[in-house]
Each structure stands twice: as C-alpha cells, then as structure tokens.
Amino acid sequence: MKLNAEFFIRLIGLRDAYTRGHTERGVFYAQLIGKELGLTSQEIELLKLGGYIHDVGKVAIPDVILLKPAKLTPEEYEIMKLHVELGYEMVKDLEIPWESLEVLLYHQEKYDGTGYPFGKKGEEIPLLARIYTIADSFEAMTTRRIYKRAKSWNEALKELEELAGKQFDPDIVPYAVRALSRIRALPLGENNCPLEIEKIRWSFYYLDSITGAVKGDLFLPTLRAFIEKGEPFCLTLFDIYNLLEFNRKHGWEEGNRVLKKLVEAINIQCCSAVDVKDVIIKLMKQDILDLTSSVIFRIGGDEFAVIAPYIPPQEKVINVVRTMEEHGVKIKFFQMQFPYTFTKYEEVLEVLRNFMKKEGKKGI
C-alpha cells in the first residue's frame, strides 16, 4: 500500500502541484475523522489509499481546464467531472482493494443524491467515501486559490454543519467537526514538479502569445490579492482607442505588431527587467508578497492593465503614450492608487467597468 500511495503522490505532484498538496492534506484530515469515528487501523489504511488515488484521473484533464484560474464554464465542468471515471479506468486493474477504489469512485457523490457520477445518496455511498468527501471538501474550503479566498477554520467548520444532510452524512459531520476543531491548517506539500516544467506549462495557458503580457484571466484575481495584501500599489490602464481604424488601414498583422510594441514600451518605461514566466509562477502560487516588479495584463483586445507595487513616475507613462504615437496609434491611460484613490475591490472594479463602458468597450 505504501508504495502505491507514494507512486500516486508523485504522479499527481508532477501533473499539478496544487492537486498534490490538496491530496496530502485531504488524506490527513480523513485520517483524523476516521479515528474519531473509531475505524480500525486497517480501515484507516484503506481510507488513506483511497484518498491518495481519488484525484489521479486529473492527470488526464487538459491543462486549459485543470489550471484555469477562474470558475469553469458548464462545458469545462462536465469535462472536469470525468476525472472520476478516468481515474477508475487508470487504476482498476492494479492491486488496489475495492474499499479504496470506492473512495475514488464515490468521493464526488452527495448525501442528498445530487452528486456525480452516479447520483447515489445516503448510505448507498460507501462509508469511507462519505468520510473522504467531508475531508476533501474541508480542505478545498480552507485553501486559497488564485480565484477565491480561503475560508477561516471556523467558517469551514460551520459550513460542514450547514451542509449536513445535504452534501455530507449528518451522522459523520459531528465527528468531523470535533476532530478538525483540534488542529489548524497544514502547509502545502513539497512540489516535485520541476520549476522549468511548471513555467512552460503555466505560460502556455497564461501568457498572451501576441504581446507577451499576462492573459486577462489572472488580472482580477491578482487585483483582489493585492488589495487583500493591504500594501500600497498602483493600477494603470492603457487603451489603444483607434486600433480598429489602424487595423483597417494597415492590416491585422501590423496591428498585432503595434500591440507588442505597446507592451515593450510599458516594460521599458514602467517595469523592471523580469522574466514574465517567473511572474506567472508567483501569481499562480499566490506568492505576491515577494513580487517587486510590475505585471502587465492584456485585459481586452486593445486594453492593458499594469499592477505595480510602486507608483511609476508620470513622465514614464507619458513616454509610453508618445512612443506609441510614433507608431501611429493613440493611447489613453488612467491611474489609481491603493489605498489613496480606492480601498476596496468593488470600488476599482466599478471604475474599470465605467471606463470600459465610456470607451464603448465590452467591459470586464
């Protein structure tokens, strides 16, 4: 069993560092709940192995879905749900006890029958799977992702109680709350995925291939993270407001070249020299505390946002505008400074939406 567990930890860790940490913490929480319930040592081992393999099917999910930093679309969610059946197909012929396989097969089922893939309910769901569902969900609640904040320990415990009889077995929840109340959050597990592989993989999804800026998917989550950090920073928005006219006159290829030139100009005037792939790694790991460089996001067809942990001198921003005028395009920009001109995420979001609306854009 130990060899099997170690194999799956390494396999998952190489595919997605977050999933590895999620699995290790989930297994730890499941053990605590199982012991509180009075499971035998053999049952605990079966539960642990089931936890180690429960998400192995995610290695077959495309990066564009698995690593997405925002809520999945209904279509993407349907693909993500396949990880259960894919995982079972991957391991069903290995020497893994059926009780552990049941954890894999049924960990997404809900007590009220609204889960997947089979829609089982109540005690139709095997005991070990009912236990692991609670541990798995609790881990997700208390772990921060780029697109959501982590719930506090007490908030998560309260949610377990609120979902008793709906998502979770109401007879197990009191034991889970008692067991989990005695501890606090665990650190992320060690990431065995080589850094260069992570850079390539995440950059493939989050790096805009035309301009070299970070894709807009990461903009709002990063903005929220900077606000939550609580330290001063500056937000600058650049808009090429005559790009459509420019493209009609000079062609789309020339328009793409101009977009790239804008990012180059922003980098020269407003940003320190940094590998954007390193920046993406920091953003994905929520490691903004050590982020000392500006980050350029392409948030629309011709709009770019720059989040900087310092205020770029006004003349530097104006130099960007003048540089782009030499290339035949017109630039508008505005700056906001936290916590001087805004203090809340909703405030800056409203300003951004109004700006986009004013300029005839679709908005963010």
Swiss-Prot record:
GGDEF domain mapped to chain residues: 231-364
Top-rank taxon, per record: Bacteria
Organism: Aquifex aeolicus (strain VF5)
Origin organism lineage: Bacteria, Pseudomonadati, Aquificota, Aquificia, Aquificales
Name of the molecule in the record: Uncharacterized protein aq_2027
Pfam family, one: HD_5
PANTHER family the record matches: CYCLIC DI-GMP PHOSPHODIESTERASE TM_0186-RELATED, LIPOPROTEIN
Annotated ranges, domain HD-GYP: 1-192
